[in-house]
Structure formats: C-alpha cells, structure tokens
C-alpha cells in the first residue's frame, strides 16, 4: 500500500508516476477522500475528549444533585450516540482504502519508462548463444520421447497444464531443489524455511496478491488459498512485528509447490512445462532497511544468477520498464534463460524490490537498539529458481543428437553419479 502522507505532499509527482504505470491521475480524488476521512476522525477524537471530560465531572457529582447530574447524563448519552454515528460513517467510508488497494507501487527512479516487455532494458548477458543451431528439440518433445515426462495421462487425472515426471527426470527435479538450497544457504547465507502452502486471505493481501489478483489463485472452500509463490508465506513471517535492527537483513529461502490459475493466459504456452497450474520453486525473500534495500536487491539477483552460472545455462538480465513491472514492485530485474529449442530467451526468474509497499500493508517495522521509534522495513523477493523452467532449460541446452540429456557437472553428485539421462527402461 502507498503512503497517503507522501501522496498528499507530492501530488504532481504521484500522478506522474501513475501515468508511467498507465493509470489515470488520482491525487485529487485521494486528497478529497482522505480529507473526508480525516475530518470524521478529528470529530471522533473531539467527541471522545468531551465524553472523557464530562464523564469525569459526572463521577464527582452527587447523583442526588438534581438537574446538573441529569444534564451531564444526557450530554454523555448524546455524545455516545454521535460517536456511534461517526464511527459508523468512518467504517462505511471504505472508498479511500479500496482505491489505495488497487494502486500499484511507485516505480523507482532507475526504472525506464515503457509500455511492455519490448521496452525493457538489457543489463547484461552471460554465456554463449548459438543462433544458428539446427534440429534442437523443445523440452516436451525430448521428455516425452524419453518416456520420462507425461502430459496425456496426466490430463486425464488433472486436466490441462499439469505434468507427471518419472524416473531420472523426477530425480532431476529433486536434485535441482537440493542443489539450489545448498547454494543459497551455504554461499549466500539464506535461512532455509519450510512454510505452509495454505494461507489466509490477509496473508495474500499483505503480499499484494489480493484484492486485485484474486482470480489468479486457487481458493479452498473453507477460507484458505494455495500460495502462488513462497514469497507470500515468507514475507508474512514478519507481519505485525517490530524487528530489532541488528537482526536485519533477514534472508529466507524456501522450496515449495506453487499453484496458479493462469487466468488470462489462455492460448499461451499450452504445451510443455513453461506455464503450469502446479510447479515447484525455490524462493528467496529478504527483509531489510530502506538504506540497504538497493544493495540487497543486487545481492539477491546475483544469488539467482549464480544458479544459472553453475548450471552452465546462457541467460540475460533485464531491467523491467514501468509497463511490465509487477503490482507490488518498485524495481524488478527479470532473468531470461536461453532455450535453443524455442530459439529465444524466456523468463526464468524475477528479482523485485518492493520497498515498504508490502510492509505498510502488514505493519512490519524495525527499530534501532535503545530507540522507541520504528520504521517500516523494506521487503524483497527473487526466484531462486523455479524447478520446472530450470529443467526445461537443461533439457534444451544439454540435449544430444540421440535424444539423451547430459547432466550438468554440478548435478552429477546430486544425481547419484548419473552423467546422462536416457530413455526409461522397464
């Protein structure tokens, strides 16, 4: 959620930032609604003070004193009725909060203006890409031919956008998760967490998924939602807390299943493992101070890139433009891995600095030692990485002419010494 005080004091800048996000100016409307809310709040405070004063006087008067006592009783009763009316008005005046809940984060000054992904800025590339490579198959062709990846029978069980992995591909999925967790915990100091994947609506609201993206998640019949990313569970570990400054940055990593309805993705990536309803992902989250969040963003992006470097996968890092950024982010890097079967780069990770946007929603603060003052933390998240898309990249980049898949060197030990994935044999 955005800072209403900042909006009041920076109306022109606020409207300009909204335009960069292709949203109509809202400052005047917000000022109007905020003014109404503040007026009601001030009246409530005045009446509460008057009630306190009159109640104190009433407590010091003999009930048998007659008109004075009865008059004060009537005054207190009238004040209570007025307070009830004002508090009802305040509760019904939800338009301001509803409006603020629909507004995305403000883009950082370094974010380029742009309409869509075609206007993202290239930051760096890593690894060699052979644009002229011939006869490179896509991952689903390879996996099905090896009889280690099943879509047809799985569709009878769960429908479209699901997959079943078997044999050495199932082992590769497990190996990738263990490898990623080892790198993030051992080399980058993230604390491994095993969080719940069923969360309440307020947790989804805190992280920015609700109310705007309700149709993109799966809801149960008893008030829970399946997480679209472990970011939801991890950032909410500090909801409604005050963290000692010396405990920051708080770096967390989790490996969980993720669930997405893929609403609005009809017709996109209908074949293969690129866009599934259920997939596994290693997720990074950091809770830090405003002064450190910029450097922490680079640190987390480096952690994600390191996984691809160790796997020997070519990639490029893009700074997203204003028209392509996520709702809660103020600055995002996308890491795109090269897929020779598709002859294009595809997103494999997003690394976002959300500033205090999520923290304001979930009331997450920190304070310096010996101080009574508190400050909103900054929250950051990064894919570290999605297992399925990483497997896609390995299949396409490490495929051999006979259809087998060479296991990347760093995964051989995780695969029990297996160096090549071949067709499944009964």
Curated annotation (Swiss-Prot):
Compartments in which it is found: Cytoplasm
Pfam families xref list: Seryl_tRNA_N (PF02403), tRNA-synt_2b (PF00587)
Q: Which UniProt keywords apply?
A: Aminoacyl-tRNA synthetase, ATP-binding, Cytoplasm, Ligase, Nucleotide-binding, Protein biosynthesis
Question: Main location per UniProt?
Answer: cytoplasm
User: Per the record, what are the reactions this protein catalyses?
Assistant: tRNA(Ser) + L-serine + ATP = L-seryl-tRNA(Ser) + AMP + diphosphate + H(+); tRNA(Sec) + L-serine + ATP = L-seryl-tRNA(Sec) + AMP + diphosphate + H(+)
Q: Which residues bind L-serine?
A: 229-231, 283, 383
Q: In which pathway does it act?
A: Aminoacyl-tRNA biosynthesis; selenocysteinyl-tRNA(Sec) biosynthesis; L-seryl-tRNA(Sec) from L-serine and tRNA(Sec): step 1/1
Mention one GO molecular function. serine-tRNA ligase activity
**Which CDD domains does the UniProt record give?**
SerRS_core
The kind of enzyme this is, by top-level EC class, is ligase
Positions of ATP binding: 260-262, 347-350
One of its GO biological process terms is: seryl-tRNA aminoacylation
Q: Which domain of life is it from?
A: Bacteria
Q: Which InterPro entries match?
A: aa-tRNA-synt_IIb (IPR002314), aa-tRNA-synth_II (IPR006195), aa-tRNA-synth_II/BPL/LPL (IPR045864), Ser-tRNA-ligase_type_1 (IPR002317), Ser-tRNA-synth_1_N (IPR015866), SerRS_1_N_sf (IPR042103), SerRS_core (IPR033729), tRNA-bd_arm (IPR010978)
| GO terms for cellular component | cytoplasm
The EC number(s) given in the record are: 6.1.1.11
Q: How does it assemble?
A: Homodimer. The tRNA molecule binds across the dimer.
Q: What does this protein do?
A: Catalyzes the attachment of serine to tRNA(Ser). Is also able to aminoacylate tRNA(Sec) with serine, to form the misacylated tRNA L-seryl-tRNA(Sec), which will be further converted into selenocysteinyl-tRNA(Sec).
> What is the UniProt domain comment for this protein?
Consists of two distinct domains, a catalytic core and a N-terminal extension that is involved in tRNA binding.
| Family of the protein in this entry | Belongs to the class-II aminoacyl-tRNA synthetase family. Type-1 seryl-tRNA synthetase subfamily.
Q: Under what name is this protein listed?
A: Serine--tRNA ligase
Tell me which species this is from. Answer: Rickettsia bellii (strain OSU 85-389)
Gene name as annotated: serS
